[in-house]
Amino acid sequence: MKLATGLWVWGSLLVAARTVQPSASQSVCAGTENKLSSLSDLEQQYRALRKYYENCEVVMGNLEITSIEHNRDLSFLRSIREVTGYVLVALNQFRYLPLENLRIIRGTKLYEDRYALAIFLNYRKDGNFGLQELGLKNLTEILNGGVYVDQNKFLCYADTIHWQDIVRNPWPSNMTLVSTIGSSGCGRCHKSCTGRCWGPTENHCQTLTRTVCAEQCDGRCYGPYVSDCCHRECAGGCSGPKDTDCFACMNFNDSGACVTQCPQTFVYNPTTFQLEHNFNAKYTYGAFCVKKCPHNFVVDSSSCVRACPSSKMEVEENGIKMCKPCTDICPKACDGIGTGSLMSAQTVDSSNIDKFINCTKINGNLIFLVTGIHGDPYNAIDAIDPEKLNVFRTVREITGFLNIQTWPPNMTDFSVFSNLVTIGGRVLYSGLSLLILKQQGITSLQFQSLKEISAGNIYITDNSNLCYYHTINWTTLFSTVNQRIVIRDNRRAENCTAEGMVCNHLCSNDGCWGPGPDQCLSCRRFSRGKICIESCNLYDGEFREFENGSICVECDSQCEKMEDGLLTCHGPGPDNCTKCSHFKDGPNCVEKCPDVLQGANSFIFKYADQDRECHPCHPNCTQGCNGPTSHDCIYYPWTGHSTLPQHARTPLIAAGVIGGLFILVIMALTFAVYVRRKSIKKKRALRRFLETELVEPLTPSGTAPNQAQLRILKETELKRVKVLGSGAFGTVYKGIWVPEGETVKIPVAIKILNETTGPKANVEFMDEALIMASVDHPHLVRLLGVCLSPTIQLVTQLMPHGCLLEYVHEHKDNIGSQLLLNWCVQIAKGMMYLEERRLVHRDLAARNVLVKSPNHVKITDFGLARLLEGDEKEYNADGGKMPIKWMALECIHYRKFTHQSDVWSYGVTIWELMTFGGKPYDGIPTREIPDLLEKGERLPQPPICTIDVYIVMVKCWMIDADSRPKFKELAAEFSRMARDPQRYLVIQGDDRMKLPSPNDSKFFQNLLDEEDLEDMMDAEEYLVPQAFNIPPPIYTSRTRIDSNRSEIGHSPPPAYTPMSGSQFVYQDGGFATQQGMPMPYTATTSTIPEAPVAQGATAEMFDDSCCNGTLRKPVVPHVQEDSSTQRYSADPTVFAPERNPRAELDEEGYMTPMHDKPKQEYLNPVEENPFVSRRKNGDLQALDNPEYHSASSGPPKAEDEYVNEPLYLNTFTNALGNAEYMKNSLLSVPEKAKKAFDNPDYWNHSLPPRSTLQHPDYLQEYSTKYFYKQNGRIRPIVAENPEYLSEFSLKPGTMLPPPPYRHRNTVV
């Protein structure tokens, strides 16, 4: 908390905080907690420092030395031997720090919650003055906290000190030391110092007391031998082996001896087996044992404490303030500002003032600042309603200090503290317990009940309208002679007197707090309550009083008011009445004579005589009497006797017994009926269950059944070819699947569990199979089957191009903006599908995204994925290794995984793509990632990304999971960007980039080296169901832009090809495929033998994720060959004839059925079968043809008409700058065949209508309506991945790299 500048103009404030001398040899003084705050007057700053610490040996708190000039005498600091808090030396200009006798810094409080010793910025920027030597030659122990020495321009020798010998726990995270070698004027240590010293002479050598000790020593030592070990209670070294030879104590100092605990109040006597009072008991006060606690502390058991706990109340016994358990409800004690529940609060404000309702005691401080009274817009805190300040009218004690720097302008006094009796000063603010500063509207203080300020000084200044302050005798409030007063720059006393603002004439010379007889510190004559009066009502008045010294006390209510001139009472209580109002029982006046009193052997009854005095009845009277004899006893009217005869008592007793038995019977019957009814309910419920009368499930969850199919493969159908990877739990092979009874060969990845793994690994293996078999989406890998051999085998489709991380790294010079954004959309759609299926992936990263083709990626690696139940919203992991750098903060701290935590991983994955395979947080140890994220650091903006793309990443990395976007929103956002890619990603030469042939991939080449793949068939191609054969239709090209559209000067944005959905209709034969129904193909072959033809093109032509294109002349059906040619068409680009020949462009440049116009050629690219790329005869293939990478500028040659050329994104440069727009001269298509592409049903699979694109819900439709068979991939297991880290490895102590991932100071 910083004070205003005006506060620090102290004048002659001399602070003496010395409070107690625990022993004859050591004096204790209070520390400060000002940090870098200082007085505006440097002279006063020095004088305050000197008064604080002169002749002080133990600083109970922090030692802060700041803003001291170079010519000041600091020799008074030599007396300090111990500091319980931290030592701060900053912003000074002196040359030498004379803390020569300081031996131990306990570090009970740390500077910036980290350092016990902080020394920095001790030099003058425009001069040659500054700290040169640390005179800490006897400092040998820092019990808690680290050392920070930095930016001391002239400081020497600090880098030679062996700080690890001084610091008890020298963790790298709290040790910071900047080298001072090379500073001007620095010399070397004396030769006897062995290179470690505080100064240049032999008297400045560092004394090592820990690192030089024998191994048998469990603490410090005074020599290298076993016999030189210090006592285990010693701290900072010793001069001998005894507990009285310690330089400082580890725990407590009991009259010079270091002990584990102070002598207790009670000790056990083994002879009497009893706890007996210990006459040598002492109280613990800090690190000392004292016979008496300081006057402003409270005794709790055997300790000196600042405040009693909530279950106890503060009482005073024999002049000692003690904490005693409350007999009933404790008086309400509330936490003050800066303590307990208000630890982080800086001022009383509208957000916390209600916590002070009905409080009688404040354990801590009350602080009123401008941000509390007038509000804090920055923190959205409203101004305080002045009426709410009345909650402090119940406060009687403040154990800390009262600091008022701002007050409501419409309040002219502090009357809300009218019941405040004591300001304890157990915590001081720069030595102050009462501070009132710059309150221009205050005219009087009105602390009318204040009787004591136990400790600390008073500072009241710059209150221009304040009066009455000069009349107060402040010393009557002080408990010690060392307390001081600074009161100045308030309203002049003569001006107050001139306006009549003076004390009431009934006030004594001690002064007053304000106008009126109720504001006096003491009364000149008499007082009634808080009001001073001239005389008591002894002989007249509405109510009568008696004098108790100078206090008028009202007579007891049983005293009869006497006539004027006569005393009604002469003391307190009903026994001092002159005459009773009602009756007199012995010496006391009572309202009536007592009916019954407990005597020694019987009850006693009394009656009143004619003088209204009470007397006892005759002993035979058992129910009262009217006189002294037995005949005056009270009789029962029906017997005529004073007591009831025996025969009259019998019926009453009998009636009572009968009534009691009747009640018992009723209760027993009621209980029996209750038990019977409960038993009948149970039987009926069981009968209904056995008779199947239940119409609803016992535990309805609302979750749909998982109807995914699991294919069981025989071991004879699988052939292993090559090991692709292995780990702790299994091995991944490249293999071939030959379905039983078929002639096709399908390349697959086979994941085999090791034989040495246990049952738990088998269960986890099958859990992964469950997840993979449950997904069915174009951008998610799906399980092909499971082989239940002795070692379980998972079979997935083999991905020809490896993982996306390696792919972008290998081809980073040839990847354009369109392709990057397409990948972002595909990954988002895949994750959106997982979210709809309540699957949490937990391990999304670029390494876990596979490349089926350059334009089609799939998410894989479900080894960490978990399926949430119907009522679950999050998954709690129990252990294992985790990819920390890809995980959200809640996953790292609490191991809670949700779909929103997958969004965080998605943002990191996109960052990897945009940096072409960059490593997130490269160079930073994984265990330090949580701290960096909590401090607000995130991955930097990739160079190619505009702010639009980067802001999407940043939204994915919000700390609040609910603030992150949904995958649905991410897919919509990146779809929008993909329609205009060069606006959002800036890549040099983007429009000229040509993605290399898929066959050029290193991963792909490695797969082809060891097996003849001519007869291979892609797994998805094999899994497409064969319903019937359809004649191969003749396809036509689609017109993208007509000439009329170009004439109006509107150029449509580049289009993004959507990745889901397909719908096209054949007009031949009446066969049609609708959405969600895969289209079978008829096998065809070329009639020109010279033309190389790509075989086995997949059905991905109708998958929305395809972006490659092929163009080929129509061919005729061929005879049946093997099972693969019987199942599919070799050319998937053969489309149905047009359905509607009339079409025109919509606003986005897409076709809508309208009318015929001349059109340019538009191609929807499709994928090639990645495994059919070479022929045995060595003919030139389409993918090996140089023409693959560029388009011809003229008409195609006749011999090239049948060449299959994939069209990759960003490989054509035309006027539109879009890979999907091709020049007229590129390909020639017969005019009669151009209308097929105008069929709206054909284009429905490519892109939804514009109205749908502009609505984010279109992603729901296009991501969940269609289901496809998926492939597999290969990855190293988690145990071998360096990006995964066990939660037990997250420990502090790792080096931080340079910025931007660390703070300014380095760690050593």
Swiss-Prot record:
Which residues are listed for ATP binding in this entry? 724-732, 751, 797-799, 843-848
User: Which of the residues are on side Cytoplasmic?
Assistant: 676-1308
Q: Indicate the segments forming the Protein kinase domain, all copies.
A: 718-985
Superkingdom of the organism of origin:
Eukaryota
What positions does the record give for the motif labelled PPxy motif 1?
1032-1035
Motif location (PDZ-binding)? 1306-1308
- So what EC number does this one have? 2.7.10.1
GO terms for molecular function, please?
Answer: ATP binding; epidermal growth factor receptor activity; epidermal growth factor receptor binding; GABA receptor binding; neuregulin receptor activity; protein homodimerization activity; protein tyrosine kinase activity; transcription cis-regulatory region binding
- Modification after translation: Isoform JM-A CYT-2 and isoform JM-A CYT-1 are processed by ADAM17. Proteolytic processing in response to ligand or 12-O-tetradecanoylphorbol-13-acetate stimulation results in the production of 120 kDa soluble receptor forms and intermediate membrane-anchored 80 kDa fragments, which are further processed by a presenilin-dependent gamma-secretase to release the respective cytoplasmic intracellular domain E4ICD (either E4ICD1/s80Cyt1 or E4ICD2/s80Cyt2).
- Give the signal peptide, or none: 1-25
- Active site as annotated: D843 (proton acceptor)
- Catalytic activity entry: L-tyrosyl-[protein] + ATP = O-phospho-L-tyrosyl-[protein] + ADP + H(+)
Membrane topology of the entry: Single-pass type I membrane protein
**Could you mention a single GO BP entry for this protein?**
response to progesterone
Which cysteine pairs make disulfide bonds?
C29-C56, C156-C186, C189-C197, C193-C205, C213-C221, C217-C229, C230-C238, C234-C246, C249-C258, C262-C289, C293-C304, C308-C323, C326-C330, C503-C512, C507-C520, C523-C532, C536-C552, C555-C569, C559-C577, C580-C589, C593-C614, C617-C625, C621-C633
Q: Which UniProt keywords apply?
A: Activator, Apoptosis, ATP-binding, Cell membrane, Developmental protein, Disulfide bond, Glycoprotein, Kinase, Lactation, Membrane, Mitochondrion, Nucleotide-binding, Nucleus, Phosphoprotein, Receptor, Repeat, Signal, Transcription, Transcription regulation, Transferase, Transmembrane, Transmembrane helix, Tyrosine-protein kinase, Ubl conjugation
- Cellular component per GO, a single term: neuronal cell body
Summary of activators and inhibitors of this protein: Binding of a cognate ligand leads to dimerization and activation by autophosphorylation on tyrosine residues. In vitro kinase activity is increased by Mg(2+).
Please tell me which stretches of this chain the record labels as motif PPxY motif 2: 1298-1301
Oligomer status and interactors: Monomer in the absence of bound ligand. Homodimer or heterodimer with another ERBB family member upon ligand binding, thus forming heterotetramers. Interacts with EGFR and ERBB2. Interacts with DLG2 (via its PDZ domain), DLG3 (via its PDZ domain), DLG4 (via its PDZ domain) and SNTB2 (via its PDZ domain). Interacts with MUC1. Interacts (via its PPxy motifs) with WWOX. Interacts (via the PPxY motif 3 of isoform JM-A CYT-2) with YAP1 (via the WW domain 1 of isoform 1). Interacts (isoform JM-A CYT-1 and isoform JM-B CYT-1) with WWP1. Interacts (via its intracellular domain) with TRIM28.
Q: What family does the Swiss-Prot or TrEMBL record give for this protein? A: Belongs to the protein kinase superfamily. Tyr protein kinase family. EGF receptor subfamily.
Q: What does this protein do?
A: Tyrosine-protein kinase that plays an essential role as cell surface receptor for neuregulins and EGF family members and regulates development of the heart, the central nervous system and the mammary gland, gene transcription, cell proliferation, differentiation, migration and apoptosis. Required for normal cardiac muscle differentiation during embryonic development, and for postnatal cardiomyocyte proliferation. Required for normal development of the embryonic central nervous system, especially for normal neural crest cell migration and normal axon guidance.
PANTHER family according to UniProt: RECEPTOR TYROSINE-PROTEIN KINASE ERBB-4, TYROSINE-PROTEIN KINASE RECEPTOR
Full protein name:
Receptor tyrosine-protein kinase erbB-4
What is the species listed in this Swiss-Prot or TrEMBL entry? Rattus norvegicus (Rat)
